[in-house]
């Protein structure tokens, strides 16, 4: 199957890239990095994000959104990753997704138009830190309409107008400035975001009426897809910058990029990044279309993207030589963002374990047959997963 962006998605991609190139480049990112006490949410950027419809991409038209779907949202996420762009775009989009998936008509009418327009900002707390991306790992407990628990590493909680919190009985809306809510800023390695610990002590929670384990799992999968696309955006930018630099960096009287060992390594990295891009884009399509292999596609995409981004940003630092290790160079922006997102909504090991479970379940159910000519492998989005091993590796021809 040939899968590619349609014309609307390509136009969106060009528009996002153009804005970030011309109006919010790496120097603007550096200004956020150099102001760790600030809120990490530049007003000019939020205005553009709101006005250009990047927040409305998943909100249905009947609620003042544009309803372009998860592939279009992934296009935006990929561009934001490439630019290491700060701000609560992801949290706001996921808050809107929670309301869209599980909210009542009244809840949708109240929140979706405001979130789509950027009039309200969102933050989400869906998992305990380090836990696998499953509904049973909710960070809060609900009791009679109130929530308790410590929510760790919540991005942009300080500027949010609404928190979406997962508890054992589903998703809840919480007023960040309400009684029983204490928000404490945390020091972050990656200064392209702001994180906080949110303590809930009997805080009022408005349950999203259609919450269920299935809905929470879908929200977690959608979050993982967007993070995977952010990671492949980081990886592609790291590879591109490295190739351009090594064309001009001279050692032993010639550009280092002309040495065979470096050329071969960067060629291999290009293949890996391309595979990760295809896997992440296909996962977005599979989830949006409700395909049977959607869960498998999500875990392949997230694990592959995390591994590839880690390799790409590490190589970026190494192949830039001494300057790549300095604060003045932007390589550490990408490295720190990739490291943070590597663990968001399930790390590579957790997603490979999920891949293994899904493939074993299929095999037990007879859906994979006896392995046959493919040697017990299945292919999703151009990336092959070995049956029962949970390993996502390689690309099919």
For each predicted feature, which ranges?
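Alpha-helical interface subdomain recognition
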Residues: 1-83, 114, 118, 221-397
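Short, exposed beta-strand "edge-strand" segments with a Pro/Gly-rich flavor and a Y/T-containing core
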Residues: 1-5, 17-24, 64-68, 87, ...
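Glycine-rich flavin
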Residues: 25-162, 166-184, 356-359
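FAD-binding core of flavoproteins
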Residues: 106, 113-240, 244, 362, ...
């Amino acid at each position: 199957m040939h899968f590619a962006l349609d014309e609307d998605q390509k136009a969106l991609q060009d528009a996002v890239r153009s804005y970030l190139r011309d109006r919010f480049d790496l120097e603007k990112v550096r200004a956020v990095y150099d102001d760790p006490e600030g809120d990490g949410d530049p007003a000019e950027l939020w205005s553009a994000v709101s006005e250009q419809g990047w927040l409305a991409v998943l909100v249905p038209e009947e609620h003042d959104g544009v309803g372009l779907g998860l592939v279009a949202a992934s296009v935006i996420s990929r561009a934001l990753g490439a630019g290491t762009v700060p701000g609560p775009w992801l949290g706001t989009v996921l808050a809107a997704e929670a309301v869209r998936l599980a909210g009542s008509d009244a809840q949708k009418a109240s929140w979706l138009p405001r979130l789509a327009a950027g009039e309200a900002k969102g933050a989400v707390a869906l998992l305990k830190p380090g836990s696998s991306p499953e509904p049973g790992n909710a960070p809060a407990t609900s009791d009679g309409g109130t929530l308790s628990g410590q929510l760790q590493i919540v991005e942009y909680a300080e500027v949010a107008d609404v928190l979406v919190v997962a508890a054992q009985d589903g998703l809840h809306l919480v007023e960040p400035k309400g009684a029983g809510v204490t928000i404490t800023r945390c020091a972050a390695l990656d200064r392209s975001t702001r994180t906080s610990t949110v303590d809930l002590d009997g805080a009022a929670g408005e349950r999203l009426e259609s919450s269920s384990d299935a809905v929470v799992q879908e929200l977690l999968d959608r979050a993982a897809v967007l993070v995977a696309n952010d990671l492949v955006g980081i990886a592609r930018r790291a590879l591109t910058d490295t190739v351009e630099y090594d064309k001009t960096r001279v050692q032993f009287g010639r550009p280092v990029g002309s040495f065979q060992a470096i050329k071969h390594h960067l060629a291999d990295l290009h293949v890996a990044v391309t595979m990760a891009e295809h896997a992440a884009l296909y996962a977005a399509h599979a989830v949006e279309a409700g395909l049977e292999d959607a869960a498998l596609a999500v875990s392949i995409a997230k694990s592959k993207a995390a591994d590839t981004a880690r390799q790409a940003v590490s190589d970026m630092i190494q192949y830039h030589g001494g300057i790549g290790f300095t604060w003045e160079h932007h390589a550490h922006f990408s490295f720190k963002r990739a490291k943070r997102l590597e663990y968001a909504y399930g790390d590579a090991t957790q997603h490979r374990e999920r891949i293994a479970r899904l493939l074993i379940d299929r095999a037990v159910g007879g859906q994979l047959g006896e392995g046959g000519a493919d040697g017990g492998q299945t292919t999703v989005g151009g990336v092959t997963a070995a049956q029962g091993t949970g390993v996502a590796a390689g690309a099919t021809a």
